[in-house]
Curated annotation (Swiss-Prot):
The organism's taxonomic lineage, starting at the top: Eukaryota, Metazoa, Chordata, Craniata, Vertebrata
Family the entry assigns: Belongs to the RRP7 family.
Species of the source: Mus musculus (Mouse)
Segments of this protein annotated with the region Disordered: 1-24
Protein name: Ribosomal RNA-processing protein 7 homolog A
Stretches assigned to the RRM domain: 59-159
Intracellular or extracellular location(s): Nucleus, Nucleolus; Cell projection, Cilium; Cytoplasm, Cytoskeleton, Microtubule organizing center, Centrosome
One GO-annotated biological process of the protein: ribosome biogenesis
Length: 280
């Protein structure tokens, strides 16, 4: 068997890599020291006729089986030899729509997807997709010039990133809230201008504004509301939950009725004793 393998290798005949229909398998390694490669399955992004998708089909490469250690930066670097890359997006499952472009935050990041992912790589030109599908590989995720942290080094880096600068965090939150308040004020001003103005079909949009002010969205206000709801539930829950609790409540109620009855009897006797007989 060993001799057959050597002959097959010497003859240059390589077995085809099994891959899903319509996909091209490209080997990828974490580093040059790794012997067994992992495989990325790539194809041009296509959708069924009549299905809407925001990804440009002629310039988008769809990739399956992306390992957890392969980040957007490393995937972009591995495929940069195929052409200029516009965007790289990793997702938990296939999606027909691009994620909305929002300003990146220094502190608030989307939750990382555990396990394997799918990727959408948008090239500047359609030729980049064709070049990526013809790659032979293996692609290297971590190189000497672009090291990808793993193991304890990654844990240390993640811990250091979790320690935030309070002043910088406050400035970012203040800037976000200022932009949010400005947006809400513009929407209210626009709604006030359009109030009572009929549209093209002659309909008038009626909006209702409550007299009571809305509770402030602060942590203290939220805690007060939660504490109030907790006390309200505590009064309702577990009341006469067990049979013995129901019996004790009933006995206490009867005892209170007897006590009240005796007090009423004494008060009536006292009133009778104080009453005087005056026939004339």
């Amino acid at each position: 068997m060993v001799s057959r393998r050597k002959k097959r290798k010497a003859g240059g005949h390589e077995e085809s890599i099994p891959s899903p229909p319509g996909y091209s398998a490209v080997p990828v390694k974490f580093s040059a020291k790794q012997q067994a490669p992992h495989y990325l399955y790539m194809r041009q992004h296509r959708v069924r006729q009549g299905t809407q998708s925001t990804w440009p089909p002629d310039r988008t490469l769809f990739i399956l089986n992306v390992p957890p250690y392969c980040t957007q930066e490393s995937l972009s670097r591995c495929l940069s030899c195929c052409g200029t890359i516009k965007t790289v997006e990793l997702q938990e499952k296939p999606d027909l729509a691009e994620s909305p472009t929002e300003p990146k935050s220094q502190f608030f990041h989307p939750k990382p997807v555990p396990g394997f992912q799918v990727a959408y790589v948008v090239f500047q030109k359609p030729s980049g997709v064709s070049a990526a599908l013809n790659l032979k590989g293996p692609l290297l995720v971590s190189t000497e010039s672009h090291l990808v942290k793993s193991g304890i080094h990654k844990w240390i880096s993640d811990y250091e990133d979790s320690v935030l600068d309070p002043e910088a965090l406050r400035m970012e939150v203040d800037a976000f809230m200022e932009a949010y308040d400005k947006k809400i004020a513009e929407e209210e001003a626009k709604a006030k201008e359009e109030e009572g103005v009929p549209d093209e079909e002659g309909w008038v949009k009626v909006t209702r504004r409550g007299r009571r002010p809305v509770l402030p969205r602060t942590e203290a206000a939220s805690l007060r509301v939660l504490e109030k709801e907790k006390r309200k539930r505590a009064r309702k829950e577990l009341l006469n939950f067990y049979a013995w609790q129901h019996r004790e409540t009933k006995m206490e109620h009867l005892a209170q009725l007897r006590k009240k009855f005796e007090e009423d009897k004494q008060r009536i006797e006292l009133m009778r004793a104080q009453r005087k007989f005056r026939p004339y």
